[in-house]
Amino acid sequence: MAALLILVIVAALLALGYAAFNFIGVKKLDEGTDRMSEIAEAIRVGANAFITYEYKIIGIVVVIIAIIFAAIFSVQYGKFSWEPSVCFIIGVVMSASAGWVGMKIATYANVRVSNTARKTKNIGSTLKVALKGGSVMGLCVGGFALLGLFLVYIIFGYGLNMISISALRDGQHIFTQCLSCYALGCSIVAMFNRVGGGIYTKAADMGADLVGKTEAHIPEDDPRNPATIADNVGDNVGDVAGLALLH
């Protein structure tokens, strides 16, 4: 069992380490012209502001749900049961960390992929940058998920004396609840990112169409329209971070 646990934590750390390596590699690439850097920075600032505010809202919801879980399981087991609530919070932290890294790499990789295509005119070089940027999100999802499961098992598997089969059978109810609450914690962040980012994107998209094209006669997806920047902010949060976390 100890060997399997070591394998799990090593796999998680390798995934996160390689994700960090690719993150740094993509960030070192040239952003391109001043105009490209200006637009990318505007999207980056907007995405940071959006996800920071969103995570504050998630934090409030998480605290409320954790308290409810503690109350429900305490009544169910006839004693104060804090374990499922802690596992729920661990899941939230792991998922939020993966989502934040995914959003950051998206805002860095987008402009660098465009600049690589502009400079090299080579699809292979362009895809290499795109895949390296995309791998960061994928590796972080797997790495943080494994790290969270490792923590849940180490803290509550060993801590609740559920190493042997018989002991695990005796305490399977609370341990199963711990795993379920961990998964729910991961899912709730994905839901907020996906739904919140999607609504934000659609609102900005409609605003850009109605005001930009209809009233101001600005072409679609023109960066002079602030709603276009907001649309791209929502894409980075909802379509990159949110969609990746759902899987």
Functional labels for PLM-detected ranges:
Residues 2-247:
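Hydrophobic, small-residue-rich transmembrane alpha-helices and their short perimembrane loops
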